[in-house]
A protein has these predicted regions:
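Binuclear metal-ion centers of metallo-dependent hydrolases, dominated by the metallo-beta-lactamase
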Residues: 143-145
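Conserved AdoMet/S-adenosylmethionine-binding subsite of the radical SAM
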Residues: 2-139
Length: 145
């Protein structure tokens, strides 16, 4: 695998759920992988500043799903409060801004096109340069008898 990853610039991505909850494991894993492998974290940043700081030296790329910058929309969708803007500003102090990709989803029944545009403007205003506007895909379950 090492030859393949070295040749392609590949690596490992931790995502699903909230990977920052396993920060200690990710750090130990990062210490074991061959030099040159890219470690990516796909996260909602629902973690402490200390966790962000501990992961920063090991994570080559941060993919951050913000849901929405509007705190009311965020809380209605997730059920928890948000410090996402403050956390993104903190990450920018620790890593190069081009290593941070922020996903802004259109979430049916939670945010509007205007909400998404507003979130993108806020992100640009704090200096985020890699912004991906995405369409939220609801999982469809088919039950057969």
């Amino acid at each position: 695998d090492n030859i393949y990853f070295q040749a392609t610039g590949g690596g490992v991505c931790f995502g699903g759920g909230e990977p920052t909850m396993n920060a200690d494991f990710i750090i130990e894993f990062a210490k074991l992988i061959p030099k040159g492998w890219k470690l990516t974290l796909e996260t909602s940043l629902k973690c402490s500043y200390k966790t962000i700081e501990s992961l920063a030296p090991y994570v080559a790329e941060w993919i951050v799903d913000i849901k929405d910058t509007n705190k009311t929309i965020y809380e209605k969708y997730t059920g928890v409060s948000s410090e996402i803007i403050q956390q993104l500003c903190y990450i920018k102090e620790l890593v190069q801004v081009d290593k941070v990709i922020v996903k802004v989803p259109h979430i049916p029944n939670f945010n509007t096109n205007e909400d998404v545009k507003h979130s993108i403007e806020i992100l640009k205003g704090i200096g985020i340069t890699h912004i991906k506007e995405i369409t939220y895909m609801e999982h469809i379950t088919h039950i057969t008898k």
